[in-house]
Amino acid sequence: NVPVVLLNGSFQCPNVFCVLCDDERAMKEAMNQLLDSGCKRVLYLYHSSNNSGQRKLAGCRDALAAHNLPVDEMLMRRFDADKFSIHAVRDCLMELEREGLQFDAVLASEDVLAVGAMKYAQAVGRRVPENLSVVGYNNSNLCLCTEPELTSVDNRLPAICERIVETMLGVLEGREMPEKTVFTAEIIQRGSTRAAQDK
């Protein structure tokens, strides 16, 4: 009978309360924006295969399907979390380029991966966003530390955390609380992406 409150996870069970961001919809919108801006080969870079990670990956696939584009598994790359650093991401992308993988955008599941993509662009002389568009996820302070500043998906983490506390207190006080609360993300546009092209 101990209540459980999950952060950004979903689990249907009595006395379990879930507060999460709609990661699938958010990543679908981010991929859509890149495709609508003229990007043809978007590299999706991620490091986690947890519930949130699976929803993000599904969103990418949904966007490609909506644009009648096939899913190229070579462009869906899981980054080794054991080597998780900005410079390691840069080196990984440089290696992919040396192997012949072509991409004109990087959509990352976390801002730190996107910053690594920005470092890659700087290292190989690709101009952002003219030659490479980059989008991160979480809208962290890292977004303001790049040049140009990083476009990122704001997954409303502060609001989610507030709602978790409200839910937990409500449950402990005996009030009826919603079993599932889903927040809608927002894409914060900055200088690392181009505007949508006219159709």
Description of each model-found segment:
Residues C39-R41, D104:
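Short acidic/polar active-site loop segments enriched in Thr and Asp
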Residues L93-D198:
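Flexible loop/turn connectors
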Residues S37, N51, A63, H67, ...:
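Phosphate/oxyanion-binding loops and surfaces in catalytic or ligand/nucleic-acid-binding neighborhoods
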Residues R41, V71-L75, R127-S133:
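Short acidic capping loops at alpha-helix termini that bridge into adjacent secondary structure
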Residues N1-N32, D36, E97-L101:
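Alpha-helical recognition/docking segments in bacterial nutrient-uptake
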Residues L35, A65, Q122-V124:
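Short polybasic/polar patches that bind polyanions
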Residues C18-E29, L45-C92, L107-V115, Y137-S140, ...:
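Hinge/beta->alpha junction and helix N-cap segments in small-molecule ligand-binding domains
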